[in-house]
Amino acid sequence: AHTGAQQVKANDAFICLRALFYVATGFLYRWQAIRKMLAFDATLIPQDFTQIHASDNSEPTVSPDLTDHVSSEAINHPEPPKSQPSESLESEAITRQCLIDYMLNEAGWEILHVKGDIQGGKAAIEVKIEGMNKQFHPSGIGYADYVLFSKGGKPLAVIEAKSTIHSPETGRKQAIEYADCLEKKHGVRPVIYYTNGYTTKVIDGMDYPDREVISFHSHDDLEQLIQKRGRADITHLMIDDEITNRPYQKTAIKSLVEWLNRKHRRGLLVLATGTGKTRVSISLCKLLDNNNWIKRVLFLADRTELVKQARKNFEKYLPSQTMTSLSDDTEPNKSARFVFSTYQTMINYINAEPVEFSIGHFDLIIIDEAHRSVFGKYGAIFQYFDSLLIGLTATPRAEIDKNTFQLLELENEPNFEYTYDEAIADGYLCPYRLKKCNSKMINRGIRYDDLSPEQREQLEKVWEYEKAMKGIPEDEE
């Protein structure tokens, strides 16, 4: 039952009803209660609605007529479907209504449901496009599935939709042709999307390879993307010596900037503990900001203490920038230039309804201690945001998991590495000396029952952290 104050739109209710129908039909078919998969028939929906009140009985009941036809064998060993309903997501129109419309709404777009209707700041459907290739469009006219317009009436993006049974690539060429025609007419090239509802790819006009995105960009995101097309490569590396004055720090920044100039969007720096990973990230942010590459930055760490420490350092060296912490601030400033958060807090934000941050809200995400467990447990963060992504770690290259390199789009090596041994040889770190110590805890071990409530809470936090770092599932002890 819907108990919230927000009214459910008729279209959303219709989509949910259809989805529920197919879930129920699938169960009934696999339990052999029905002989074939049924198609959803919208004509059976009553047009004269009366309000229905939920029953006070919380226990669901099942009709004996149904259970008598379902054998225990069918329930325990259900047969996979051998037929498909005639009405399904295979229809391009249904793909748009069930999947693409929903994604656009989540991104803040209001969809105009009258074909060809165009209003500033809204998503238009079946938009007439003139100047198409007459070899494939004899009249020279085509109709774009969606065009997203700026508040001033300029096309910010065009979307070509295909049904779920087709690859989104089948719509790529057509989407590009729509963009060509819109650019000739309006003087601005729209961002291009092509999608089948499950996989969506974007061509942003900045010469990056086509890339997959989880959803569509908001109105403000698209305006920022188009503005970024005017930025140049970073050729003058004005690195602030007050932040990073050591040679290896400057080399790390230069290596990463050169990598980004070559149209890569992800990178990894390996710097031994104590050699200034945070300072390097601050200096990199200042350099990218000065060259108009970034506006908003998200810094992620796995512990609140590390988030606080990072924010303190950023505030020290970039005092004029607005900063906030999602993990600590009572009322975080979500529009701040620099946002600091633990991974778990950010997961909560991107799972919130309504969505707290659009997919293009951040231009750069910095990951403190990038390794497999972070990508495994919190990978949804990096799938959700469409941004530059830089990983920092003290883990030596030889110990970095292959999947980490793949997720950062690297060929089994970081963009730059500065090892512990190099830091000692250069005089930036001192070698350690091992001193053997003993204690009651080492001799007797930790007995949970002997701990105070405060110690138990601390131990549980340590255990949760270790599980997260080692990728241990929640249900394993």
Give the role of each language-model region.
Residues 11-15:
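Short, charged, amphipathic alpha-helical segments
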Residues 300-304, 327-329:
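A short hydrophobic beta-strand->loop->alpha-helix junction that borders the nucleotide-binding pocket
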Residues 164-166, 198-201, 304-306, 344-347, ...:
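Conserved nucleotide-binding/hydrolysis micro-motifs of P-loop NTPases
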Residues 245, 299, 367:
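Conserved SAM-binding loop
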Residues 402-477:
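Interdomain helical connector at the RecA1-RecA2 junction of SF1/SF2 helicase-like NTPases
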Residues 8, 19-296, 305-321, 334-338, ...:
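ATP-dependent helicase/translocase motor core
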Residues 1-5:
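Histidine-centered, metal-coordinating catalytic motifs and their short helical/loop contexts
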Residues 355-391, 396:
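SF2 helicase catalytic motif II
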